[in-house]
């Protein structure tokens, strides 16, 4: 356009100019224009044009063209070309006319002549020509430039093309090369590859760093030189070893020889040896690896694994793998097949070489073992842990070749002749570890696990147990290396030969892997020192000191390290043994994670990788013995003891256990040999474990393993006590380690760790330790089965429970293990610190003094909120809102964890987070996938394996870890683990909660009070709740076996996972949900209690969760809250209750499940299940629920509303359901201004129904129906109480059909009113109601149909009579008292009849807590035997009357003590509701575990507690019920102490509700019997289970909160109340949650009242 402008203007000028000259031009003549003038004028014009340019240039110059003048002329010529031809004059005139104007501007005002005009004409032409020429030139230039540009582009394109072709050629070459490559060559690793890949996350840092350094392709020159030197020295060493192998001592002497050479050239020798090993393998596999650097880097171990079988390394590899649980696991699975191969360690050197190369793969074998264990996998794992372990423990105890260590290997091991020598072998390997320690510290958790060749001494470790006096030092030294490596960051010191294997074990350590690098350095000196010291056995004391100084790298840990070391250093021998214990304990803790892994091995889950840390240690130490240990140990509850016990047992005995306990055996071996050394190192590790989370995890499982091993080998009480104490202490640390996994970043409060270290070492020698030993001992006779884990659990009361709690958050420690909790020991210290140094409930002693201690410890933990991880583990085993790493991991680990959450917390589990365990997820995702979340489910990490190592599961998914330790040698622990994997978050939380709740009724509540989300009691109950642990063991073994599924909660009564879920839920929904979490726990336990739950464990926990979700979807918030809230109440479930429930559960749950499947309505199934369960467990529940109810009422008026919405849900069983129902009615009535008469009416229904049921156990159809109707009536009344409470109750009276009609009506009315979870589920748990709120009509329909099934007429009569009785509250109260006494009497009288009637059995189970040992044993044994399920067989064995009685006493003491003490009162408040619901949940869940898996899992713990309570005192229970009844107002909540002290309180609605639970219990009792008899029984169990599930949901604070939130007004109000209640200790969780979660307006009223 500028050109256009200029062009136009020049033309203008021409035109304007010409008009003036026109006359002259015409006069002169058109032809007169002379060319000369043209040029000058042309120039002039150009000048003019340019001159005017100032005006034009403004327009024209803007054109970027460098020729402003030419463009104007160009148009001018065009115009002027024409003028000259014909229009010259015109143009000239115009131009002339215009030019004068333009000329003045240009300064040419004088040009007006004709000549000027002509000149202008010529000028225009010239200008046009010039302009045209210039334009053409410009165009040509532009074209030239364009051509050059195009040429450049073409050249660039050509270059690019050439490059592309070159690249294509290269790619083609690469493709050709790749096509030539065989993927399997790199994946060749003999099934270790995929496991390794799974675990490589854990050990990749250590291994890959090392591999990169050591692999031929990636080796730096200096490293290559070192490699060459190492190869040379290794060859020399091998020659030495071979020459020695010719002699008997080749196994033991060779390691010593290796130790001597490596020590001199510490880093070099170690590195060289490792490189030699690797180079040897690399040379062998170089061709395979060299093709791809990755292959060299990653595949070296894998190739080695697959390759070594060709040469002697095959044996070594196998030996290493057993040490590193790869082959050990197969050996375990194959009984001795792999052991024969692997255990005959070809040469310690070769073993070390292969370990160095196959550390990852070695660790992987743990998971492989899980696969190999498949022959017995799911059931075998559970069975082995619960039954097989329980049964085999005696065998395995003698079985030195527990996992199939061939006798020749044993002999070779023995050839060393002295356990010390063999252990020294291991220690020698350990000594080289320091060099590797740096590597491991730098990049590996693996390194901490792979500690040293101490594994070699595994068999001698068994010997050590036998040779307690002398062997302690030797065994300490022996196990010190392994444990040091496992537990201590210093373990890396053992890397050279031992480190490889140890590392392979180390790798499985979840927690360690993630956060072990730093502590390793600090601990490494300790490990090395200890290893060195252990080499000298007594030199170890100085080494310990040097250890403490040498672990400055772990500065945070050092204070503790110094303390622990100093304390242990006091006496070399004692210190060695203690340190060995401590180390063993810590190893047990570390192995705990490993053990979970071990279980994973058994289960073939990634957890085994973690387990390998401990397992590898064990297997490495003593292939055969280690596996025995591992087998028994990681069986946690059952297998650990047997493996330890069966050390002397022939290999034949070992295979079954091996399959189940293979990893545990490894862990045990690791633990025993390493534990001794680790006694000091372990203490040191406790400080270091802060980073050594994996080690801590391993310590967890390993603690139990170590405890068992040490217990078995160290039968003497003194050593055993010390050992057990340290072991448990470390186990607690380990558990804490899991929970702190997420706080691991916080460094877990080093000072606390230090204090804990001091405390731990102090406790190691403290009576508490010995008391733990008693617990240890209690099951020790049966094969360390219960003894070890009991110890773990008891000691873990503080430590295990805390540790479990730690797991919960991590999991998805979540499942994942909680790498954040690096040091189990450190956590233990924190735990001590937190729980109170004086009251150390590390292990509950046989004397049962620890429960109070446990409460104390939990309390302390709660008090020490500053140490969140420690607190977390205690509170919720990974359910802290802050770091539900386990829960979140879980997936656990898991939790974790997912996590293994972290690895599991979150995790979670977690879960799945152990999960996740995940690590929390570090724990392979079996649990968390989580959690497994790997080990910690990695929860989240989740949920590695439910069957194998419940302890591991708990570790993996903190929830179950807690249970595992709690139920130490019982199926309970196992069940918890199983449950954990499934619901890393929810179930893990439940398990945690249950474990905590039963363990620390007061402590847990207090903890909850301190940090509701943390579920303070979680850890404590699990570990410390000996009764809970023991009894669940009996009943859970079946569930555990049937459900080796990661959620082993079916077996475990205290579903720590559930609890974890609770914590998770609180984290998700409300800080106050911790109470809800507790409630949640009870629900899962019942499921696990159920054999059907056991059968459905794999499906059930998830199924349970699915129902939970279904309910949650229906009333998501409410149900979720209820579900999570319920488990803690369930925790009160006694092992006996669990067993009794389990017996029925198998049939009922399955039947109910069928019904549930038949009836698409989950609510209906739940209802029927609830009905059946409520009736069947009614006898147990009357006590459990009544106690729980009274406790709930007395504990918290605030919780009353919470319980009202959540109590029913909270009550896993029908009893609790009905009680909660009553609560709901009562509380709702109060909140809703419903008259006490109406509440009485409802209560009367339930009570009458219950009485009827109790009175007529056989006509249970009627009672069941009645029970269902009354409950429904209650709920419906609760739901519709404001409008039609009386009418509805009366309507119930007319008949089942009418009632059904009304109930169906109520659902619409009640659902709207109770749109929250509670109201709908009258029969079902109130937790069911959230689910049922949506499906109330169907549910009620189903329920009523069920009622009809039972007996329409009797139901009608009973309802009418109940309605009649409703008005007479006093009568009802007396009735209830009668019922309570009747239940008590019945429980006493029916103990022998436990199998006859569900109610009787339940009552008997409830009575288990009562003084009668037969009551305890009979219900469990009879139930399990009646079920004829293998699972129960093992529980019976592990559960001695004595043990059960002790557990019950412990539980009673806790319950009573809690009630008595102020702190306990607070906890009681929170716990009582939990207990009540737990009790109910347990009862109901047994029949309906399938449907109610989550609830069942939660309920067992509470039921256990409730059973204890009821057993403790029927009178007390009656008082509590009465008080609770009087305490009907949600607003008025008395503490448990208040209830106990002032039995009679305002009894209008509260009393009624309190009574009604008893009635419900009675009805449940009758119902149980009826279930078996009548077609309704299938439905009834389903109803119970479903109802239980619903109840669970309602009880779950989280789930319930969610559902409550769904309803606008009521839910909002309820939620607020819920939050307040949750914030309240545990009070609101139970009752408030039930109320709130209940969809009914009563919930709101209750909440308001409680508020």
From Swiss-Prot:
- Carrying Phosphoserine, the residues are 415, 533, 739, 1176, 1329, 1499
- Can the keyword Cell membrane be found in this entry's annotation? yes
Write out the GO cellular component annotations.
apical plasma membrane; bicellular tight junction; cell junction; focal adhesion; Golgi apparatus; lamellipodium; nuclear body
* Species this protein is from: Homo sapiens (Human)
What processes does the entry annotate via GO biological process terms?
A: cell differentiation; lens development in camera-type eye
Concerning its family, UniProt says: Belongs to the NHS family.
Q: What is this protein called?
A: Actin remodeling regulator NHS
Biased composition, class Low complexity, residue ranges: 629-648, 980-993, 1408-1423, 1465-1496, 1588-1618
Q: Where is this region: Disordered?
A: 1-104, 235-274, 288-314, 494-598, 620-669, 835-888, 980-1004, 1017-1071, 1383-1436, 1454-1509, 1526-1651
